[in-house]
């Protein structure tokens, strides 16, 4: 009798065969081993049977990790083992978390940990979709109140046709890289980058992916049934409706009035005062009944209902705007003297100080992946300090949210960057959020575009971004342009769109409810287009194209072409020659196999000095040209003269003078400087020199 009770489910998902398996590995957790094409991911889910005492939020943790052994690699570094999560691992952890989190019911506070480990990879595709399907399947057999399963799909666009789950090779040809996740009836999450595609193309990709993923959703349902998944016995806590009505009678009008205060900090102060008043009125001193927690929960519920009812009834939004109006915008560029490019972008109470720094090829980021080490010439780093929202906090490395927002902003900008062969600089953008009240990632897109143009980076087009929101009750809904932080928190959708006037470059969508229809997504996309064009218009009033020259403080670069056969002369033995040039000129030199040489110098003079040395090393000998040479060796029949670095020629005794020379040593000495003319270069490259009729110094 086997010690394993293995349950398997196989299905075809686009070009990949998918296998779900449980019962063989990690049997003390709810575990699914998922294989998709050449990728295998082990996904383990552990759910605590009870919530911790006093727990008032849902502690869901998703950790995605890639083991280097999965691709037959040994990790780098001193310890030769995997370290902290990479940026890519963090982003995929968030990608899995986002569509799963809204499918747990309100009031469910049991801790759940999802660990997805890539254990095998043929390096032809990402493991994110496989990990997402595995997480969905593992949750479906875990006995939690998970309203899934979900499916996930990647969508590409190649030659105008949508492609399901493209591999790396296909993505390199694709105008779109979109990941969509959802249930049988609803889209819950979208993450994408695109090459200036239309709203219709983006919506079509979302719907295509959602339709195709139904194969996976149905397969996971069948897999869970075969595994004997049991229904959750968790019961939602009942709300104190009597207390809610009392709070509503006493505070609904006051809360509604507080939400007409446009300034965020003043509004929060007013709401805090109302909450303190509610506690004083409804919570007795030395309370041991837990009513204080109920008052807190129900007061938040009342705030939620009040804001949503106001919006759906057509009243002005929190700051007095209608649903389509974008907040006031202020644009400043060149705000920092020494930065290569800088911009201060302010939209309402959200502000980003964004800088662009240009570097040489040595500044590129080296990224280790399962597919190998790759070089990244573009970085965008997003920082969200506590002071941006008027709070104190410990400063540390970037958190998951900051990494995610930085990647979204990067996606918004990347499609309009110039090609590397046209603009070979390494680019680093830093967005420091100095004020925040919603949509700071989209402010980062706007600021990045402005600072790039201020730095002289020739963008294909300026880009801007806008965050959209949604409030939906039954058949009534309102799409909100340029949402505030409160509208994000109290709404049903966070829908971010970045792009140029030509099309969308990035789209991110997180939906908290089911029932988001194609009509709603279409309305949101079209409303976002109008908002994006308004923001671009405001930006273009200040700067609409790259400055004619890059910053005087940025490194300069020159490009020359040399004979590929001469590359070894520039590099020298063990790299000695190129190292000497670099040390003497302080320039960075990048040589390609085809003979293209890029020289980066801190100044133009430094770059040109390095080029002069390279040209001297690689120059071709020209017959008839006179060179300043140095005698390096005397022989009976003449002398050998060095005329260029690494290039010697023979000065025959008969060519030393118009008069007869009996002994070479009578006229020339080793180390003597002479002027010589190239008389001939034979087909074997041997150089014949002459001093006849040449005036010597």
From Swiss-Prot:
CDD domains per UniProt = KH-I_PNPase (cd02393), RNase_PH_PNPase_1 (cd11363), RNase_PH_PNPase_2 (cd11364), S1_PNPase (cd04472)
Cofactor(s) this protein cannot do without: Mg(2+)
Localization annotation: Cytoplasm
Q: What catalytic activity does the UniProt entry give for this protein? A: RNA(n+1) + phosphate = RNA(n) + a ribonucleoside 5'-diphosphate
List residues of the S1 motif domain.
624-692
Report whether Signal shows up as a keyword of the record.
no
- Quaternary structure? Component of the RNA degradosome, which is a multiprotein complex involved in RNA processing and mRNA degradation.
Q: Which family does it belong to?
A: Belongs to the polyribonucleotide nucleotidyltransferase family.
This chain belongs to the protein called: Polyribonucleotide nucleotidyltransferase
Source species taxonomy: Bacteria, Pseudomonadati, Pseudomonadota, Gammaproteobacteria, Moraxellales
